UniProtKB/Swiss-Prot annotation:
SUPFAM superfamilies: MetI-like (SSF161098). PROSITE patterns: ABC_TM1. It is found in: Cell membrane. This is Probable anion ABC transporter permease protein HVO_1887. Part of an ABC transporter complex involved in anions import. Responsible for the translocation of the substrate across the membrane. PANTHER family: PERMEASE COMPONENT OF TUNGSTATE ABC TRANSPORTER. GO terms for cellular component: plasma membrane. The keyword Metal-binding does not apply. Residues 16-217 form the ABC transmembrane type-1 domain. It is a multi-pass membrane protein. Its main location: membrane. Keywords: Cell membrane, Membrane, Transmembrane, Transmembrane helix, Transport. Belongs to the binding-protein-dependent transport system permease family.
Length: 232
């Protein structure tokens, strides 16, 4: 029924590999930036905290094409980062996906951090724990929620099409290997060609990846303390 047999195996493996590479790199970068933000915001009460959390939540709804356009302008030859010549490269795609995945990761991990009981933090402080000790304790207690945040961000990144199409250029070489074409942009190409069955086949692969990520996320959500009476 589906036209997977019509696809070059090299092409199929290549676009899947690019999708996984770009999404994984974007989530890793988002984690490096986002987890410290989640801990900093979750640990402290400060003036304007509600505004910060509102901005983070709003960021989850960033239109991907707008993000792609902004990154395009920044990386273009006349843009501030034009000298690095990153436009239409996997690195440009990673940057755009990081911008989209970061608010998701921060928002979900912040909720996990804030769900750790204050009494637990106070007890650790009373026992002589340093700020680092308390931070590590909170991370350990919120670990399932943090993993859920990582998986949610990954699902956001790997299903992205608008921004990666703008900044990546959807480039594939003559030997059928992909440079910046992903599963999502390949589906767009096949749909425009009228190859609906091939597009559906690629969509099935993408859907399987997303469902796998969501299944892992659901598993960790169920193991988060306070949910369904289960926890550690």
């Amino acid at each position: 029924m589906f036209a997977l047999g019509d696809l070059n195996l090299t092409y199929l493996v290549s676009i899947t590999a690019v999708s996984l590479y770009v999404s994984t790199a974007a989530v890793a970068l988002s984690a490096a930036l986002g987890l410290p933000i989640s801990l900093a915001v979750g640990f402290r009460d400060f003036y304007g905290k509600s505004v910060v959390t509102s901005v983070i939540s709003t960021g989850m709804g960033f239109p991907s094409v707008v993000v792609g356009l902004v990154v395009l302008l920044v990386l273009s030859r006349s843009g501030p980062l034009g000298t690095f010549e990153l436009l239409f490269t996997p690195e440009a795609m990673i940057l755009s996906q990081t911008i989209l995945a970061l608010p998701v990761l921060v928002s979900v991990s912040l909720s996990a951090v804030q769900s750790v009981p204050q009494d637990l933090r106070d007890a650790a402080f009373a026992a002589g724990g340093t700020s680092t000790d308390i931070a590590l304790l909170v991370v350990r207690e919120a670990r399932y929620g943090i993993v859920t945040a990582l998986l949610a961000a990954y699902g956001r990144a790997i299903s992205e099409v608008g921004s990666v199409l703008i900044v990546g250029g959807n480039i594939v070489f003559s030997d059928s290997t992909s440079f910046t074409r992903t599963l999502t942009t390949a589906i767009t190409v096949e749909a425009r060609k009228g190859n609906i069955e091939t597009g559906i086949a690629l969509g099935a692969i993408l859907l399987a990846l997303v469902l796998g990520v969501n299944a892992l996320g659901a598993r960790f959500r169920d193991r988060t303390p306070g949910r369904n009476g289960r926890g550690r």
